[in-house]
């Protein structure tokens, strides 16, 4: 037999073997898909029941269902790992096997997996049920929704906002801190068991694209793309930041620096994530009709169902399907009125078996109107790829899923669309001023959130990479917040806080960079769909409603799910494989030009040195080694606790003696910032009754003077080694300048007199006697009998007059 025949037979044998392997893999996946859909549905349903009725019983049922799903998935993942991907040529089979070979949290031991689930459930419960109570009326308590969110959305009372902001972080963030520390350790262990460097790397793996030549994308490219696009966006953000700062100075004139960062609690919501609610305070042209149509919705008696029905009409108008009957039956579109505790944060659910739902405590506002479009966009994506195999039912990447609803929101927010549904009057006329009003409102929501999103995820990536030590998490959080976002903490926080976890997405284990990438994608999609809709004019005026051409182009992409690389899906819609920020910048170009003109006499950018509490802070310097030598002790958290307690004692004494008031100051009312290793720091004091009431620095100084000796004794130091800068030491007279004007005049007069006396008696008095006589003239205490000595009580050791602390 010739060599060519042997070669042909070999190729046939290889092809046959390969075909058998693929048939076996396909059979395995078909069986998996059927079983997975049933178990996944049961787990998702139990999770839905818990999120819409938070009880111990429902938590237990959710954990049991999740454990069954996890055990099944772990078993199937191990079987999938027996298939060599190199032997699989069918792209669809290969993609499913690769996904299944990633075992997720099942890679942990059963005990650690159970521990992780318990931590996640506990964090979710703390977040969803956390309350902030009024210290003056402990029965008056506020949930986040409804309650605190309303204060942060509408109040212009600086102190009330600060009370809500601090209360949420003190009550919820502090509880989450130890749990979040465990969460980071376990999630990193899980990620490394799945061959990722850390959990941040695991999240970025969602953006990997491979298998199709020219469309590859690795997870490290995501970091580069985010960094580069942020540099392009930053000039627009800086202009917006400067404009908002100027406007907030008009509302809070005593609390804003014209060159500094913005206080975090003044930015429209609990986190400063979206600045949408700042629009009433920052509207450029107030004489124009209000493009926030909340009042019109209320006046027309809109309710939650009307909001979602209107969103559905939008999707149907571009050729996408209606919601299923089960959607309207099973969704939770308003907060229950039966005292159930629920997770109000808006989310879209694809439970499986064609069961699609939305959970949202809808309010009749324009913001919620747009949120409804966003959440229904998720459902449209879910329905579009429902026919894909179970493992490919997902967005091309996580940012795509978030972008779909945002595309519709861009159109739904336009004055043109709002007029068409009767929320703006038919005689509403668009001009340059209404255009700027509209674009500013859009920018407060879209541009204002980008640095927030970028910075939060960068911080988490660094935490997962162990680049930020655990004992510096909060410190680094606020350093990055100041530097990147231009936002400052209104009160200093130590490492007992977990401010990042006070946001739903952090405490509930969501990747967050999706909200950054989605913003880039949504404008790329919008530009392409507007071209399909044959829109003529600026991008910000485009409304794609009623364009089935645009809808079909979008649907073609949605139906792919995760069956191919996202770079290919992006190219199919926009003609490019890469994230591109230019459509976003083009959308806001008229606003950018206007902002630069408005800010021509203002500082653009920010200094990171200023803080709202700086003026009332006192600086402390402590010199342990120079004072105690070999006996010097280390300045630890315990020493700082003792210092804060001693200041609280001084405040109690001061208010008791000087004001005849009993005020229960505690160490928690003494706030420390800018702690340096050598040791120095700043501190100020707030009222125990109201954290937003900062005690004037002058009163704190008086309290320190009154108890200075006691404080020194506590630490074994003195006025020179425990320095309160700006407070004169109390164990010696206050410092006075050596030369003053009155003393100069007095000296001239006395000098003339002395000269006359000297001339008269110079021949009879010796030089030394003359010198002593001159000193006597200048010494008001010369009459005292120094030999006896007189005790000055003001210079006695404080221990003689007071008991030790």
Curated annotation (Swiss-Prot):
Q: Which residues bind chloride?
A: 169, 477, 481
Region annotated Essential for cleavage by ADAM17 sits at: 652-659
How is this protein named in the record?
Angiotensin-converting enzyme 2
Instruction: List the Cytoplasmic topological domains.
Output: 762-805
For bias kind Polar residues, which ranges apply? 793-805
| EC number in record | 3.4.17.23, 3.4.17.-
Q: What is its main location?
A: membrane
- Its encoding gene is what? Ace2
Cellular localisation: Cell membrane; Cytoplasm; Cell projection, Cilium; Apical cell membrane
Q: Where is this motif: SH2-binding?
A: 781-785
Q: What is known of its domains?
A: The cytoplasmic tail contains several linear motifs such as LIR, PDZ-binding, PTB and endocytic sorting signal motifs that would allow interaction with proteins that mediate endocytic trafficking and autophagy.
Q: Which Gene Ontology molecular function entries are recorded, alphabetically? A: carboxypeptidase activity; endopeptidase activity; identical protein binding; metal ion binding; metallocarboxypeptidase activity; metallopeptidase activity; peptidyl-dipeptidase activity; transporter activator activity
Task performed by this protein: Essential counter-regulatory carboxypeptidase of the renin-angiotensin hormone system that is a critical regulator of blood volume, systemic vascular resistance, and thus cardiovascular homeostasis. Converts angiotensin I to angiotensin 1-9, a nine-amino acid peptide with anti-hypertrophic effects in cardiomyocytes, and angiotensin II to angiotensin 1-7, which then acts as a beneficial vasodilator and anti-proliferation agent, counterbalancing the actions of the vasoconstrictor angiotensin II.
Domain Peptidase M2, chain residue ranges per copy: 19-607
């Amino acid at each position: 037999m010739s060599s060519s025949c042997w070669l042909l037979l070999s190729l046939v044998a290889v092809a046959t073997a390969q075909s058998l392997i693929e048939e076996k893999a396909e059979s395995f996946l078909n069986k998996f898909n059927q079983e997975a859909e049933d178990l996944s549905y049961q787990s998702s349903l139990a999770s839905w029941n818990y999120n819409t009725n938070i009880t111990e019983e429902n938590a237990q049922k959710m954990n049991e269902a999740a454990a069954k799903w996890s055990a099944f998935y772990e078993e199937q993942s191990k079987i999938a790992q027996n298939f060599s991907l190199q032997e699989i040529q069918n792209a669809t089979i290969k993609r499913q096997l690769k996904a299944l070979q990633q075992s997720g949290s099942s890679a942990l031991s059963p005990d650690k997996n159970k521990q992780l689930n318990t931590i996640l459930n506990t964090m979710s419960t703390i977040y969803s049920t956390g309350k902030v109570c009024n210290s003056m009326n402990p029965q008056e308590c506020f949930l986040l929704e409804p309650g605190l969110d309303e204060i942060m959305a509408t109040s212009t009372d600086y102190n009330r906002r600060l009370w809500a902001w601090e209360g949420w972080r003190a009550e919820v963030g502090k509880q989450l801190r130890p749990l979040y520390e465990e969460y980071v350790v376990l999630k990193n262990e899980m990620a490394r068991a799945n061959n990722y460097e850390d959990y941040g790397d695991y999240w970025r793996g969602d953006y990997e694209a491979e298998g199709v030549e020219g469309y590859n994308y690795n997870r490290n490219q995501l970091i580069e793309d985010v960094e580069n696009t942020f540099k392009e966006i930053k000039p627009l953000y800086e202009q917006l930041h400067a404009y908002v700062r100027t406007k907030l100075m008009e509302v809070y004139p005593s609390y804003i620096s014209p060159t500094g960062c913005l206080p975090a609690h003044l930015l429209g919501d609990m986190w400063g994530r979206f600045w949408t609610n700042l629009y009433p305070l920052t509207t450029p042209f107030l004489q124009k009709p209000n493009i926030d149509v909340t009042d019109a919705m209320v006046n027309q008696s809109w309710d939650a169902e009307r909001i979602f029905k209107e969103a559905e009409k939008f999707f149907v108008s571009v050729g996408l399907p209606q919601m299923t009957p089960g959607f309207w039956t099973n969704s939770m579109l308003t907060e229950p009125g039966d005292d159930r505790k629920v997770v109000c944060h808006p989310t879209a659910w694809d439970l499986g078996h064609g069961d699609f739902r939305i959970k949202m405590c809808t309010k009749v506002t324009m913001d919620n109107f747009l949120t409804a479009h966003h959440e229904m966009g998720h459902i449209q994506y879910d329905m579009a790829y429902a026919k894909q195999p179970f493992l490919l039912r997902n967005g091309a990447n996580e940012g795509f899923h978030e972008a779909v609803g945002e595309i519709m929101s861009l159109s739904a927010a336009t004055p043109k669309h709002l007029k068409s549904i009767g929320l703006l009057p038919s005689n509403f006329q668009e001009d340059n001023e209404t255009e700027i009003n509209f674009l500013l409102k859009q920018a407060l929501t879209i541009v204002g959130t980008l640095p927030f999103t970028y910075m939060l995820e960068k911080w988490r990536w660094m935490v997962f990479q162990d680049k930020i030590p655990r004992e510096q998490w909060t410190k680094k959080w606020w350093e990055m917040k100041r530097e990147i976002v231009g936002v400052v903490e209104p009160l200093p926080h130590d490492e007992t806080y977990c401010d990042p976890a006070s946001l739903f997405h952090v405490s509930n284990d969501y990747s967050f960079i999706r909200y950054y990438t989605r913003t880039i994608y949504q404008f790329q999609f919008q530009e392409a769909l507007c071209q399909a809709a044959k829109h003529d004019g600026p991008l910000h005026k485009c409304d794609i409603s009623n364009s089935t051409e645009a809808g079909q182009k979008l649907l073609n992409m949605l139906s792919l799910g995760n069956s191919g690389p996202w770079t290919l899906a992006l190219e199919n819609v926009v003609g490019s494989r890469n994230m591109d920020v230019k459509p976003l910048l083009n959308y806001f170009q008229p606003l950018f030009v206007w902002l630069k003109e408005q800010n021509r006499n203002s500082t653009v950018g920010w200094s990171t040195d200023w803080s709202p509490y700086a003026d009332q802070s006192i600086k402390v310097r402590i010199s342990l080694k120079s004072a105690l030598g070999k006996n010097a002790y280390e300045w630890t958290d315990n020493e700082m606790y003792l210092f804060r307690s001693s200041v609280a004692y001084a405040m109690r004494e001061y208010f008791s003696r000087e004001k005849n008031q009993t005020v229960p100051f505690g160490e928690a009312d003494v706030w420390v910032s800018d702690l340096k290793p050598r040791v120095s720091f700043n501190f100020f004091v707030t009222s125990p009754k109201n954290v937003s009431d900062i005690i004037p620095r002058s009163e704190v100084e008086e309290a320190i003077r009154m108890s200075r000796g006691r404080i020194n004794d506590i630490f074994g130091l003195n006025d020179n080694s425990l320095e309160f800068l700006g407070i004169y030491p109390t164990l010696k007279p206050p410092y006075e300048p050596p030369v003053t004007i009155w003393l100069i005049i007095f000296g001239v007069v006395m000098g003339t007199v002395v000269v006359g006396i000297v001339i008269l008696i110079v021949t009879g008095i010796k030089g030394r006697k003359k010198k002593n006589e001159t000193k006597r003239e200048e010494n008001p205490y010369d009459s005292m009998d120094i030999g006896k000595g007189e005790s000055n009580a003001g210079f006695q050791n404080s221990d003689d007059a007071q008991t030790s602390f």
